[in-house]
Amino acid sequence: MANNRTLARRRRAFSPLTVVMLAVTLVAFMGVPLSSTGAADAADPVESVEANRRGYTSYGEPPVAVGTSEEYVNSSELAGSRDKGNAEAEEEAAEVETDVQPSSVTIDTEERAAPSQVQVQQERMEEADDAPKPVPVRSAVPSTVAKRQQARHRVIGTAVIAAVVAALLWKFSRRRSGAPREGGENENGGEEK
């Protein structure tokens, strides 16, 4: 009967523990390349959104519009369309001015000349938003010290994982092969002869 149990154990190639160990090893080794790509050093998405809103790329350079050139901007077609738009805007402004009656407007000339504090603050905020601001730029290429540290961590992590896997596989292979266990007991629970 004991002989049948031993044969049944030997036939079973993968025990649940072996499958779990292989899965953990696979995940650990897949994690090493992912962590070595420097994913943690990638630019913060919030920073890139702020930089784009200010008109700068994540590298601190102003964005380059694709397909535009000075020739196109200065072309007669574009200038002509601008003139048409300005002429229409001036006509509308003239119509609006004629619609307003002087008796309905009762603003002192002093109030009209001095801008309010709110207007001054709004103008300052607009000027501050329009001014190009230096964007903190993270280096796209990691320094040699960072590369060495990544390589060292990768080697240490791989060595630790390999040592743990080797120790577990050695322990379970000895147990499966019928080698005597510690304490001199065999698989049947009796003393070895």
UniProtKB/Swiss-Prot annotation:
Q: Where does the UniProt entry place glycosylation sites?
A: 4, 74
Please tell me whether the keyword Hydrolase is annotated for this protein: no
Asked if the keyword DNA-binding belongs to this entry, the reply reads: no
- Judging by the UniProt lineage, the source's domain of life is Eukaryota
* Subcellular locations according to the entry: Membrane
Instruction: Write the record's keywords in alphabetical order, separated by commas.
Output: Glycoprotein, Membrane, Transmembrane, Transmembrane helix
Question: What segments bear the compositional bias annotation Acidic residues?
Answer: 88-98
Chain residue ranges for the region called Disordered: 75-140, 174-193
Family to which this protein belongs: Belongs to the Gra6 family.
Per its record, how is this protein called by name? Dense granule protein 2
